[in-house]
Amino acid sequence: QVMVQGDGDQPAARNAVPKDDNPGGEAGKFMNVLRRSGCPWEPWCG
């Protein structure tokens, strides 16, 4: 049941954001937001 639940959750997360736009999962999505907003935190801009 747990595995089925996990398989059900993952596709939904994948469909929420295009794969090319989200290469690093949640971390990648967060970095993309920083890049779009001009990345105000210098150390994170790399």
Curated annotation (Swiss-Prot):
GO molecular function (one): toxin activity
Modified residues (Cysteine amide): C45
UniProt signal peptide: 1-6
The entry's keywords: Amidation, D-amino acid, Disulfide bond, Hydroxylation, Ion channel impairing toxin, Neurotoxin, Secreted, Signal, Toxin
Modified residues (4-hydroxyproline): P40
InterPro entries assigned: Contryphan_CS
Free-text comment about domains: The cysteine framework is C-C.
Official protein name in the record: Contryphan-C
